[in-house]
């Protein structure tokens, strides 16, 4: 599994509600989200979650017409990070990630990996 993960908002919220957010830190060396995801999440983040702005907004802008802003920013950041894993559950976002060659996992898959 990759050492870096980029997370979408819904996955952060789910793991937080289950009190399992710590799993990300146990499985990955770097956990990154975008400022858009931080805003959607709306909670204080732990220090080990890095907020990283997307540098090249081209993919994010293109994706926003089909998927949520947070998901679009997560995919764009995953493109920039390279060799990372993206955690997302939305089907449209998963299809976009697949088309762009990005490896992803869902929240359920992440829980299975943590087991």
What does each of the following model-derived ranges do?
Residues 75, 94, 111:
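Short glycine-/small-residue-rich flexible loop motifs, especially phosphate/cofactor-binding loops
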Residues 108-115:
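Short alpha-helix plus adjacent loop in nuclease-associated cores
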Residues 2-84, 91, 100-103:
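Active-site-proximal, substrate-binding regions of enzyme catalytic domains
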């Amino acid at each position: 599994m990759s050492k870096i993960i980029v997370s979408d908002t819904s996955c952060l919220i789910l793991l937080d509600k289950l009190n399992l957010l710590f799993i990300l830190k146990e499985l990955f060396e770097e956990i990154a989200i975008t400022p858009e995801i931080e805003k959607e999440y709306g909670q204080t983040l732990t220090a080990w979650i890095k907020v990283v702005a997307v540098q090249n907004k081209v993919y994010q802008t293109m994706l926003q017409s089909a998927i949520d802003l947070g998901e679009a920013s997560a995919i764009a950041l995953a493109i920039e990070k390279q060799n990372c894993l993206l955690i997302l559950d939305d089907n449209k976002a998963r299809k976009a990630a697949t088309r762009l060659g990005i490896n992803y996992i869902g929240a359920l898959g992440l829980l299975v990996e943590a087991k």
